[in-house]
Amino acid sequence: MLGASSEGDLRVGREQKRIRAAVESALHRDQIELDVRPAATTHDLLDGITKFRPHVVHFSGHSNEDLIVFEDEQDAPHSGVIVTARAFANAIRATDDPPLLVLLNSCKSAAQIDDLVDQVVPFAIGMADSIDDADAINYAAQFYAAIANGQSVNSAHLAGQVRLELDGLDSADLPTLAWAPDVDPTTTILVRPTDPA
């Protein structure tokens, strides 16, 4: 989990805490290991991809159609480090074990997900427009709760959208799921129960 809010205007720590709580209360929590990197820099991205080798890369922070904003190695609020969508995709690709899913929990990031699934990962999720911070947090917590309970990628995505709808929010359709042609989100389950030995 990469979180970046160089200007301090997003509740990245709250999102990471909610995701951790959702996973820790799930059925298959023992099969999930979280690598949480608040104030994430581009070094954290590359280090996490190559060392931790995650099945899922989660980014929460600022973005738009063409870029993602990481933090700089500064202790004061700053404008961040701009990373192009292409450079981000190249970073995700720069490993022998690329992740299965990238979730960009940031504004207007859905424009980047088609290229990710065309070139890098089987599944990607992004936001179709600007999304309120609380809505993004609620979507992510519900999505990961469903994943950790053994639901398919598609069902987890739908559960996250329904969470927003049940909360009476207008942004339920903002989270967008894309997938490569050779995979099926309705049958892909990222967390399965282990067979007792």
Tell where the protein language model's regions lie, with residue ranges:
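Active-site proximal helix-loop segment of RNase H-like, two-metal nucleases, encompassing DDE(D)
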Residues: 139-151
